[in-house]
A protein has these predicted regions:
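Alpha-helical transmembrane segments of multi-pass membrane proteins predominantly involved
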Residues: 1-280
Length: 281
């Protein structure tokens, strides 16, 4: 949990550094904050305290590994893109919004309750809606931001509807209780539950960019600033996959025979469309 708090404070500190024109401190302070967050995560690796805050988040080895990966990739993007940042006049805003988005990614990696999954995805996405369209005079950037916002809202609707159906069937947002429902009722699972699983797959594969829910990615990646595209194609996808895997490899693992063919079809379609539909090499 220390990593989430550190990143949240870091985003605010960076924003205030920009307010006071301390541009030279932005990168060093960001790097220091990232290292502190990684330190908290590595400390949690040897001291697993179980689900925290009434089961809202759980920093197990799975969450820590994906969170460290997200932070390291973001750190590399910051270092490599220093010259890119210096060219613009909104340096602090770039840094701060990316760190806020990273905070959401860490939440998605470590959620143990559907409310935290939703909160993490929204924190991660809302910052990116702004960053994709941050070039106000660039029509391609504005178009990409609008498409990303509309598709993001569309996918969030599927995600929330799926969560609502699972809650209606189980009476809980907690992953442990959802798993207990599946284990204890192998032959009496509500049809609502199966419908909720399918809607969750749709909502989460939108975030991952898997076919046939990938149609927003070419325009958004092409119109967004290259730095933001780099972040979206790495950190956002890692966090989205982590959130997807946590749910289906833990709570819904007993229903593998139901959802495995769905993912197999999605994987085949994604590989097929990606192979024959590419326009740029």
């Amino acid at each position: 949990m220390g990593a989430i708090i550190t990143l949240s404070i870091l985003a605010l500190v960076v924003l205030y550094l920009g307010l006071f024109k301390a541009k030279a401190l932005l990168l060093p302070v960001s790097i220091l904050g990232f290292l502190v967050a990684i330190g908290f995560l590595l400390n949690d690796w040897t001291a697993d305290k179980g689900p925290l805050f009434s089961g809202m988040v759980h920093f197990d080895h799975y969450a820590i590994a994906f969170s460290v990966l997200c932070i390291v990739v973001t750190l590399c993007i910051f270092i490599i893109s220093k010259g890119y940042f210096d060219e613009g006049g909104q340096v602090a805003e770039y840094y701060s919004l990316l760190i806020f988005s990273l905070t959401g990614a860490v939440l998605v990696n470590s959620y143990h309750n559907f409310s935290m999954l939703f909160l993490g995805i929204e924190i991660m996405s809302v910052a990116l809606y702004i960053l994709v369209g941050i070039r106000k005079r660039d029509k391609a950037s504005n178009e990409a931001a609008l498409k990303y916002f509309l598709m993001g809202a569309f996918s969030t609707g599927f995600l929330l509807f799926g969560i609502a159906l699972l809650y209606g069937a189980t009476g809980s947002f907690d992953l442990d209780e959802i798993k207990a429902y599946v284990v204890n009722n192998p032959h009496a699972i509500s049809p609502l539950f199966y419908g909720g699983i399918l809607l969750l797959i749709v909502g989460l594969t939108f975030k991952v960019g898997a076919a046939p829910f990938h149609f927003w990615t070419p325009d958004v990646y092409d119109g967004a600033p290259i730095l933001i595209t780099s972040y979206m194609s790495t950190v956002v996808k890692v966090a989205s996959f982590a959130g997807l895997l946590r749910l289906f490899s833990y709570s819904l693992l007993p229903l593998q025979d139901f959802w495995e063919p769905v993912f197999l079809i999605i994987a085949i379609i994604t590989l097929f469309i990606g192979k024959i539909g590419r326009a740029h090499v």
